[in-house]
Regions:
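Outer-membrane beta-barrel translocator/channel fold
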Residues: 137-207, 256-272, 292-307, 315-372, ...
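Outer-membrane beta-barrel "beta-signal"
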Residues: 65, 69-72, 503-507, 526-539
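Residues that define the transmembrane beta-barrel architecture of outer-membrane proteins
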Residues: 95-97, 109-111, 144-150, 192-200, ...
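Repeated loop/turn-to-beta-strand initiation elements of outer-membrane beta-barrel proteins
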Residues: 124-127, 160-165, 209-216, 247-254, ...
């Protein structure tokens, strides 16, 4: 299969941690999606969206030959919905033909329409389109949500080089609660906010090379987003290059980024980041070491960030220890901020980049190719960490804060796989927060623990069953000087996919089985039990 199809297929594979399919607002990473972008041959990238957007996630089981490109500067994900997984399994994607039409209908009133087409009639030219429209009519109590996306893509293969291009258009509707319409604490009418976006991206890289030749990857993109409620416009662009040499096992990475927000047609906030990163790998029979450094200019202020990783095999396959230290910059832009919190009060817009300084250590291993484990401890000293508190002017909007803090995490991951028919992953994350200043007493809206359990069962390639359960601890919110607690919750989802024919599938997704209307953001309870089902045609 052509590489562009692999991108699409991998972007469509996701595991739902419960209340995702008919979520009223983006749940900010409750859905974990893994993308695999081929940067250059033998050098791969595996980006994992963290469970909570404000918690930095050190990539699991780092391999020395992997290079982890920042997920935001380089956008070839083809992800039309940021918060709702598709009932589309990896094993099924291999069996399906290239083209797909999906129709779904559910309760409460929700419909989903998706279509994907790709042409590869020529060996050196691939082009296609992806269309998606999802609408949940929740009424005034539940607040409607709507997403629409159209993506056009193409790839041209030359003698040694590949050129890829993508352009997408879309919008996302979410609704604020109108505080003036509240009666006796009950939900009243809503205020719609439509976010539009246009994205364009291009990339050229060499896929054939001699052993001593330089490998390269040049990329760039431009994103434009708007918010109707605030008459806000955000423009950001990225450009960069990756250069490496197979003999040196080193890599040079350069990235330029810029973000401008216009509020009421006036320049409101501007950020720019320039990064230059290089590393070198050393490897022995039972050990690996990576030494690297990143130099950056953030708003023209210089910054030096380290990268170090070491790995030592103590017992072949069963026990490997590792440790590392790395720093990075987390940039801000309008679209990303509204994705993290769609109820953010843009009127008080301020973009401030965050700096992560992460030290971690752990051990991992496997047994009989079925059971694997990873135990990791990490500490992240964050400068300008992004937090949200309820606005005193409106109980249904949030102000952004930037606070220095440290996050100490302990992570236990267990995985079990039986052939290709059954796999189960259990991940436990526990967090301790230490605020650097006495002004803010809590890490607002950040959980103290998160436990996810994901299960997939393939029954004779005829029926596929997915069960996912999420346990999240309580979070805190502040309104003025008063603190409030968002209770912890349990959320479970069940998905069934019946392959009636090689070109026809019937699916059913039952989300939030327990029907709990919990709060991801204060004063915004989620939808309860919801069901969506439909058919998928391939041709």
């Amino acid at each position: 299969m052509n590489k562009i199809k692999n991108y699409i297929g991998l972007a469509m594979i996701s595991l739902s941690f419960g209340q995702i399919q008919a979520q009223e607002e983006p749940v900010n990473g409750l859905d974990t999606v893994r993308f695999s972008n081929n940067i250059i041959p033998e050098v791969t990238d595996a980006v994992k969206i963290p469970f909570h957007p404000q918690l930095h996630n050190v990539t699991d089981s780092i391999k020395i030959e992997e290079y982890h490109v920042p997920k935001y500067p380089f956008k070839f994900e083809y992800l039309p919905k940021k918060f709702k997984p598709l009932a589309f399994k990896k094993s099924r994607e291999k069996a399906l033909n290239t083209n797909l039409i999906k129709l779904g209908l559910g309760v409460p009133l929700v419909y989903d329409i998706e279509a994907y087409y790709s042409s590869d009639r020529s060996k050196d030219l691939v082009f296609g389109a992806y269309v998606d429209h999802y609408h949940l009519n929740g009424g005034t109590a539940n607040r409607s949500v709507r997403t629409s996306d159209i993506s056009l893509f193409g790839k041209k293969i030359f003698n040694k080089d590949i050129i890829e291009a993508n352009i997408s258009f879309g919008n996302y509707l979410h609704e604020f609660i109108d505080p003036d319409s509240l009666v006796a604490g009950r939900f009243g009418s809503t205020i719609p906010n439509v976010q539009n976006h246009v994205r364009a991206a291009g990339r050229i890289y060499n896929y054939k090379y001699e052993e001593d030749e330089i490998r390269y990857d040049l990329y760039g993109n431009l994103n434009y987003s708007t918010s109707s409620m605030y008459n806000a416009n955000g423009i950001n662009g990225h450009g960069g290059a990756i250069v490496s040499n197979q003999l040196g096992t080193g890599m040079l990475f350069i990235d330029l980024s810029n973000e401008l927000i216009l509020l009421n047609n006036e320049s409101s906030s501007l950020t720019n980041i320039t990064t230059l990163k290089t590393y070198y790998d050393l490897e022995g029979k039972d050990w690996k070491v990576r030494l690297g450094i990143m130099a950056a200019l953030d708003q023209n202020a210089p910054l030096i960030l380290p990268e170090f990783y070491s790995e030592k095999i103590l017992v072949e396959k069963y026990l490997t220890t590792y440790s590392g230290w790395k720093g990075n910059i987390e940039g801000r832009d309008l679209e990303r901020m509204l994705f993290i919190n769609p109820y953010w009060d843009i009127a008080s817009v301020e973009l401030t980049n965050s700096y992560n300084n992460i030290k971690y250590a752990g051990f991992k291993g496997a047994h009989d190719s079925k059971l694997s484990y990873d135990v990791r401890f990490e500490r992240n000293d964050v400068k300008n960490n992004l937090l949200f508190v309820t606005s005193e002017d409106s109980m249904h909007k949030f102000e952004s804060l930037y606070e220095d803090m440290s996050v100490t995490s302990s992570i236990l991951s267990l995985g079990y796989q039986l052939n290709d028919k059954f796999n189960s992953v259990l991940e436990n994350r526990f967090y301790l927060y230490n605020m650097a200043s006495s002004t803010e007493t809590q890490a607002w809206h950040m959980p103290n623990y998160a436990i996810t359990w994901l299960n997939h069962y393939n029954i004779q390639d005829l029926i596929e069953v997915d069960l996912s359960i999420l346990f999240q601890g309580e979070t805190y919110n502040r309104v003025g000087d008063t603190e409030y607690i968002n209770d912890g919750f349990v959320d479970a989802s069940l998905g069934i996919d019946y392959h009636y024919h090689k070109n026809l599938s019937i699916y059913l997704d039952i989300n939030n089985i327990l029907g709990t209307r919990y709060n991801i953001w204060y004063n915004y309870p989620t939808v309860g039990l919801n069901v969506i089902g439909g058919v998928k045609f391939s041709f």
